[in-house]
Swiss-Prot record:
Its EC number is 6.1.1.5. It comes from the Bacteria. This is Isoleucine--tRNA ligase. L-isoleucyl-5'-AMP binds at E554. Monomer. HAMAP family: Ile_tRNA_synth_type1. Zn(2+) binds at C888, C891, C908, C911. It is an enzyme of class 6 (ligase). It is found in: Cytoplasm. PROSITE patterns: AA_TRNA_LIGASE_I.
Length: 930
């Protein structure tokens, strides 16, 4: 036997290297085979419910890192709730209708307009489901736990039927109407868009300043007067039917030198416009209030058949332009509103593809709307006063990345104005985890217009509307519920497979159809109505969930998307918000803080992270950032997170190894019998437990990460475990001092493993597999630990906080001695302490082997005065010299009692007593050489 064999060196097969990329899939298969998700739900039956409703990602392509961050965050929350006494099932979902899938099929050579619609929709469905399968595997690879066998998918018959019923209730309440209002129109998608489908980019446009000649001045203006107009959309002049002025804006009638014509512009803009137009010596002839110009009639710049009426509008400002805007009711919301109020014609001169139509005039017909500027300039002739290129923020189709236009076309709308105040009242009841989120959603609802819900596409849920022979739209409870039942049984494709009469209830009649003939709507619903109905299709309809949901958690872009549409439909149907809390996240940016994009080559695929680091590192990264704001991610950042993971893993490995001979049922030492330092560490750990439990409850992942890393680095590695080897390795295997420390080790190990489970489930399960005395076969079936409080807790904490200050001062003294070459390692030191009464009392209260805590071989508490050479602090001073004696081959301390024993061992008296008591045979035979 060798002397080193008398040491209690930690033993474990728990590997230092995690091997996450290969081990994680093995664990995941084991969880699936064991039906772990189902077992957890069964275990929590009857407990308080917690419903985190999954916002459905769009089923197209592999997941990106933003998806991963979001789903991991949800998984951490659901797992922590499940381990905190809540019944918290998780139903993942997918959004599957819409233009992107049509675009994919088009790129694959599928020609929608050349094939049977039902066959085309079948191809869309097959593709969507293939993408669901792909993303399902992506999410499962992240270790996300949920009912993957029974997700919700927006194309399933039961979901589509639930969506129809949401629409039906809104129709019954009078919230659905048809109108020809201007809507966001995407010529690149050939469809109307909702606000949520718009994104803004800078666009360079040609702006024109031109003049309309007065035709009837109403006794205010002469007919040789021209009203100056500004536009950034020259194509809309073809549909201009009025000029709008601000009622309270001052306008001036002016005549520049050398100019026979007189012009009207906003007084405030005269100076800048004169410079722009090259006017000199401008004479102001008259000043008018805008309301005085109301109902003056002007000529259209070139269309003699059209008159343009001067009208009043609150949207007119003097921030730019001329203070007068031309008004084309068919091409703008403000234009439409003031145009309708003044009985102006709603002319639309651009078709669904962005091509100018016949009513624009023969010179324009057939041209793309963006290309007509030269023709407009030619038609304006000497009415054009100036042109310039401007860069401004402009709406784009978020899918095709092409600019859009406002265009008045017959569309179906969901009224928001009819119940806007109800929605705003409900927002006040929702808990937002960021105040700016509440303000953002509130302002969006307050300021938004009615919701255009119809789309001129194929792949989506049909609007369940019929038309009578006289054109009357039919959407009554009887017909809508019948359609819902048909969809529930056959899916929405039946809408296209059957004639209108076969989609109506048997024997249905309508006074507008004396001959019993009906037509059906061919538009589909906005996909935001699809996902915005999920509270009904999933939360209400799945018995394991509760409505309203406890939490919606998505990216901050969903304030205008899913948060918004879900809120509108839920309040419209039931008068309540669909969620009790909203938690939003920022976007994942690259390591430099730049937006990720394939074209820039700065994207990070979750699959690449899994191959290089493992999903655990991605999961740990999610907790290491403040995801309420935009966050950065790169392979370098993940490498740093991987180092943190390694530190956590190896610290827990040390605890596993040094409790391998510890049976908690037999060897646990009661708290009251622990040493003061062990009590202190127990209290500190319970503070960590409380911090983490509270942070899980508040979804504060970064708090968990910081607290955990700080505890492992500062409390454990830099202190408790730093001197632990002097106890757990050196003392007798069954000694009280060793069992005291092992009691703390084991308590921390078991509980910290549970605390880590929501974040690092693979690692937690691997650790758990080494804890043979724990009852649950999987740590995921256990509960998060509760924080315990102890007697005299504050007193103990105060004592050890003071000791930590003392320790820091002692370490400075040792460092100075090391720099002066007095000692090398701290174990070579004899530290003499010159305390005042406060420190003397402190060291007595610590009631521990202070030399052991400071990792020095000898420590003396001096009574004599402090020598001049001492390193002095306010309450204490230190001197350091080399310890007397020789190095003990067993404990490595320098000790005066170190000597060669008769059993061939050079050890100190303390080690000799341990060896002689516990290894009698080896003592009798003598130890082998090193």
């Amino acid at each position: 036997m060798k002397l080193k064999d008398t040491l209690n060196l930690g033993k474990t097969e728990f590997p230092m290297r995690a091997g996450l990329p290969t081990k994680e899939p093995v664990w995941q298969k084991e969880w699936e085979d064991a039906k772990l998700y189902q077992r957890r739900q069964e275990l929590n039956q009857g407990k308080p419910h917690f419903t985190l409703h999954d916002g459905p990602p769009y089923a197209n392509g592999n997941i990106h890192v933003g998806h991963a961050m979001n789903k991991i965050s949800k998984d951490i929350i659901v797992r922590s709730k499940s381990m905190s006494g809540f019944y918290a099932p998780f139903i993942p979902g997918w959004d599957t209708h819409g233009l992107p899938i049509e675009q994919v099929l088009s790129k694959q050579g599928v020609k929608r307009k050349e094939m049977d619609l039902v066959e085309y929709l079948k191809l869309c469905r097959e593709y969507a489901l293939s993408q669901v399968d792909k993303q399902r595997e992506d999410f499962k690879r992240l270790g996300v736990s949920g009912d993957w066998e029974n997700p919700y998918v927006t194309l399933t018959p039961d979901y589509e039927a639930a969506q129809i019923r949401v629409f039906g209730e809104m129709a019954n309440k009078g919230y659905i109407y048809r109108g020809a209002k201007p809507v966001y129109w995407s010529w690149s998608s050939e469809s109307a868009l909702a606000e949520a489908e718009i994104e803004y980019h800078d666009l360079v446009s040609t702006s024109l300043y031109y003049a309309n000649k007065v035709k009837d001045g109403k006794g205010v203006l002469d007919t040789d007067t021209y009203i100056v107009v500004w536009t950034t959309t020259p194509f809309t002049i073809t549909a201009s039917r009025g000029l709008t002025v601000g009622a309270d804006i001052d306008y001036v009638l002016v005549q520049p030198a050398g100019e026979a014509r007189k012009f009207v512009v906003a007084a405030e803009l005269l100076t800048s416009l004169s410079e722009k137009f090259g006017w000199a010596d401008v004479q102001v002839l008259e000043t008018y209030r805008g309301q005085e110009l109301n109902h003056i009639v002007t000529e259209h710049p070139w269309d003699t058949a059209v008159e343009e009426l001067v009208i009043l509008g609150d949207h007119v400002t003097t921030d730019s332009g001329t203070g007068i805007v031309h008004t084309a009711p068919g091409f703008g919301e403000d234009d439409y509103n003031v145009g309708i109020a003044n009985n102006l014609e709603v002319a639309v001169t651009v078709d669904e593809r962005g091509i100018m139509m016949k009513n624009a005039g023969p010179e324009f017909e057939g041209q793309f709307y963006e290309k007509v500027v030269p023709t407009v300039i030619e038609k304006l002739g000497n009415l054009l006063l100036a042109q310039e290129e401007i860069s401004h923020s402009y709406p784009f189709d978020w899918r095709t990345k092409k600019p859009i236009i406002w265009r008045a076309v017959p569309q179906w709308f969901a009224s928001v104005s009819k119940f806007r105040q109800e929605i705003l009242d409900e927002i006040e009841k929702v808990k937002f985890h960021s105040e700016w989120g509440k303000v953002r959603l509130y302002n969006m609802i307050r300021d938004r217009g009615d919701w255009v819900i119809s789309r001129q596409r194929a792949w989506g849920v049909p609007l369940p509307i019929f038309y009578a022979e006289d054109g009357t739209a039919i959407m009554v409870a009887e017909t809508i519920e019948h359609v819902a039942q048909l969809f529930e049984e056959h899916g929405s494709s039946i809408w296209w497979e059957r004639d209108a009469k076969d989609l109506l209830p048997e024997g249905f009649t309508h006074p507008g159809s004396p001959n019993g003939e009906f037509k059906k709507e061919t538009d589909i619903m906005d996909v935001w109505f699809d996902s915005g109905s999920s509270w009904n299709g999933v939360v209400v309809n799945r018995p394991e969930l509760t409505y309203p949901a406890d939490l919606y958690l998505e990216g901050s872009d969903q304030y205008r998307g899913w948060f918004n549409s879900s809120l509108i439909t839920s309040v419209a149907n039931h008068g309540v918000a669909p969620y009790k809390q909203i938690l939003s996240q920022g976007f994942a940016l690259d390591g430099k803080g730049e937006k990720m994009s394939k074209s820039l080559g700065n994207t990070i695929a979750p699959s690449d992270v899994e191959k290089q680091f493992g999903a655990e590192i991605l999961r740990l990264w999610v907790t290491s950032v403040d995801s309420s704001n935009d966050v950065r991610i790169s392979m370098d950042i993940l490498s740093q997170v991987s180092e943190t993971y390694r530190k956590i893993r190896n610290t827990l490995r040390f605890l596993i190894a040094n409790t391998s001979d510890f049976n908690p049922a037999q060897d646990t030492v009661a708290y009251d019998e622990l040493r003061s330092v062990d009590k202190y560490m127990t209290i500190r750990f319970n503070q960590l437990v409380k911090t983490i439990r509270d942070a899980y409850a508040d979804f504060e992942f970064l708090t968990i990460y910081k607290a955990l890393v700080n505890f492992i680095n500062v409390d454990l590695s830099a202190f408790y475990l730093d001197f632990a080897k002097d106890v757990v390795y050196i003392e007798g295997a069954k000694s009280l001092e060793r069992r005291q420390m092992q009691t703390v080790f084991y308590d921390i190990l078991v509980k910290i493993t549970k605390l880590l489970t929501p974040i690092l489930p693979h690692t937690a399960e691997e650790i758990w597999s080494y804890l043979e005395f724990e009852a649950e076969d999987f740590v995921q079936l256990s509960e998060l630990p509760e924080a315990q409080t102890s007697a005299n807790q504050e007193e103990i904490l105060d004592t050890w906080a003071a000791f930590m200050d003392f320790r820091g001062q002692a370490q400075k003294a040792l460092e100075e001695a090391r720099n002066a070459k007095v000692i090398g390692k701290s174990l070579e030191a004899h530290l003499t302490v010159y305390p005042n009464e406060v420190v003397k009392t402190l060291l007595e209260a610590v009631n521990s082997n202070v030399a052991q805590l400071l990792i020095v071989s000898e420590l003396t508490i001096a009574e004599e005065p402090t020598p001049e050479a001492a390193l002095s602090f306010e309450d204490v001073a230190f001197t350091v010299e080399r310890a007397a004696g020789e190095v003990c081959d067993r404990c490595r301390r320098i000790d005066p009692t170190t000597a060669e024993r008769s059993y061939q061992a050079v050890i100190c008296d303390h080690c000799a007593s341990i060896v002689e008591e516990n290894f009698a045979d080896a003592v009798a035979e003598g130890f082998e050489e090193k």
